[in-house]
Amino acid sequence: MYHCHIHFYLTGEACGVFDSIKVLPVQEHFTHEFSESRVVEKALVEKADVILANLQNMEVKKTLGLLLEAKSEKAELIVLAAQEQMTLLTDSLSMLKDIWLLPMQEEEIHFRLLRWQQTYQMSKDFWEASHFLDSTINYIPSLIWYKDKNGIHEKVNDSFCKTVNKTKKQVEGRGHAYIWDVEQDDPACIESERIVMEKRE
């Protein structure tokens, strides 16, 4: 089982969300650490796994620019903003984990923190399960592959890649013809897969 240490960085004016996350019950296999500053501090942004930034009474574009430039690729950025600040966030939406509109009632704060916590744990559980699966199938010398109903390879093992002389990045998300360097997918292969799916065997 994994252990996950989460470093939270809280920046901007102190608010109810900051108070609530500090007393959020810690889930099994997780630990929490908090850093906090009124104005953005690059060193704290760089260390953070999760950033909650209260943009009220701050220069939105400047603050967002500092946060997005300094944060790690995997760090999640949740911004707290007033409704009238939404138009200033438009250019950055794809880089934000979420936007929480202020003011929020205590019940909504609790709901949002709980939902974030569940989603975060789910991502770590998925990472662990994926790691277990990869370790298992890569230990097996036989060719192993998982395909969707359209014949697209979703996951393959190392032996498969070695046989087709392609990387996983090249193979996953592609069909039979590309992987095996043939002009078109084998009709017999497509038919046999269709029969298996219909019979569910």
Task: Annotate the PLM regions.
Residues 31-34, 143-201:
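PAS/LOV-family and closely related PAS-like sensory domains
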Residues 2-123, 127:
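N-terminal membrane insertion elements
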